[in-house]
């Protein structure tokens, strides 16, 4: 039977810190806590969380992949929440999304964040083998708590905003977007194009990260949506993916567009990417772009194109794969007698044939 987030508060000694699943009663205090504008979002979260909890009661394979939501309260005040959802279709890796509702320092913050994340880890499916979470690189206290819980940094990404997103600047006049090169084609992300994009997604991750997230190419379909797709280069014989855009959830709960490319810089991108991003900005002027922090050529291209870095985020992971693999490991050394025993004949030796004259 699948694990379920039970409504059992976690009490800390000497204070009224509680961690429990999101309930309708929590929504009543949003207005008094200055979170009235978030009420519609919390209502959607509550509905999705209830669906996920009901699904956990149903035997057999899961029906839905809705997030399970836990909230942390201090003296009845909502301080933080965490969403927990499957990160792949095997349910072996889960994504945690932590959101602090009371920014700044308050009594018991570190203790409550740790208890909230611990309960989130305990409440995932029994098939869970790993967990990932995104965190702003400047949130030292969150990072310290995550390291205490066994999370390790796996990837650093840079978040970009376009130059026209600056409210202090006058709005840019409408213009005709730059066309793609004639040998390039933009195709939406779907079942046909996901296998073409898959090698680029794999190239963007280390082998350790690939083992932790345990994804297959159909998992890319969960990152599809408006403005996502694959940039294909027509070589005359076949179409080859040279870049892609996928939907990516950020540390603050918002969504950006992640740009994927191969490890080696492809000179065809120097012409194709500016045209692609220009078309993207025409359709979505306030888009937020996500890239690998270590991708210097891409960073240079974006800076030249007027993009500005906002911040850096870390993708951290915690895995049980290594422990399971170690328990199944075969010893590399064997006693000498055992090795020699395998060389001993199992039957009496056959007589050597005579080569003499008859």
Model-found features: residue ranges?
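Active-site/acyl-donor-binding loops of N-acyltransferases
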Residues: 2-11, 149-175, 287-358
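Amide-forming acyltransferase catalytic core, primarily the GNAT-like/NAT-type
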Residues: 2-82, 148-253
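DNA polymerase sliding clamps and clamp-related checkpoint/processivity subunits
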Residues: 84-88
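Conserved GNAT acetyl-CoA-binding A-motif
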Residues: 124-136, 282-293
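Intrinsically disordered, low-complexity segments enriched in Gly and acidic/Ser/Thr residues
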Residues: 236-288
């Amino acid at each position: 039977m699948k694990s379920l987030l039970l409504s059992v508060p976690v009490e800390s000694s000497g204070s009224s810190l509680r961690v429990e699943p999101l309930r309708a009663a929590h929504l009543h205090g949003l207005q008094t806590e200055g979170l009235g504008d978030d009420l519609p979002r919390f209502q959607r979260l509550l509905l999705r969380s209830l669906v996920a909890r009901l699904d956990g009661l149903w035997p057999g394979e899961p029906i839905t992949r809705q997030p399970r939501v836990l909230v942390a309260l201090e003296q009845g005040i909502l301080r933080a929440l965490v969403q927990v959802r499957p990160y792949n279709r095997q349910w072996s890796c889960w994504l945690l999304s932590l959101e602090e509702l009371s920014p700044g320092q308050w009594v018991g913050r570190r203790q409550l964040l740790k208890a909230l994340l611990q309960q989130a880890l305990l409440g995932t499916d029994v098939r869970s083998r790993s967990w990932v979470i995104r965190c702003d690189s400047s949130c030292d206290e969150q990072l310290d708590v995550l390291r205490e819980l066994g999370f390790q940094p796996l990837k650093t990404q840079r978040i970009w905003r376009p130059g026209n997103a600056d409210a202090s600047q006058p709005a840019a006049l409408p213009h005709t977007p730059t066309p793609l090169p004639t040998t390039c084609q933009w195709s939406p992300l779907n079942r046909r194009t996901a296998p073409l994009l898959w090698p680029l997604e794999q190239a963007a991750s280390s082998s350790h990260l690939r083992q932790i997230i345990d994804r297959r190419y159909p998992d890319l379909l969960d990152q599809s949506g408006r403005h996502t797709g694959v940039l294909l280069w027509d070589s005359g014989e076949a179409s080859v993916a040279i870049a892609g855009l996928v939907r990516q959830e950020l540390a603050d709960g918002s969504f950006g567009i992640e740009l994927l490319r191969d490890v080696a810089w492809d000179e065809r991108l120097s012409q194709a990417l500016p045209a692609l991003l220009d078309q993207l900005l025409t359709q979505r002027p306030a888009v937020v772009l996500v890239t690998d922090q270590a991708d210097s050529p891409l960073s240079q291209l974006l800076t030249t194109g007027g993009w500005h870095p906002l911040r850096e985020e870390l993708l951290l992971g915690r895995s049980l794969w290594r422990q399971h693999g170690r328990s199944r490991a075969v010893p590399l050394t064997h006693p000498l007698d055992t090795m020699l025993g395998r060389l001993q004949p199992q039957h009496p030796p056959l007589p050597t044939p005579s080569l003499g004259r008859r």
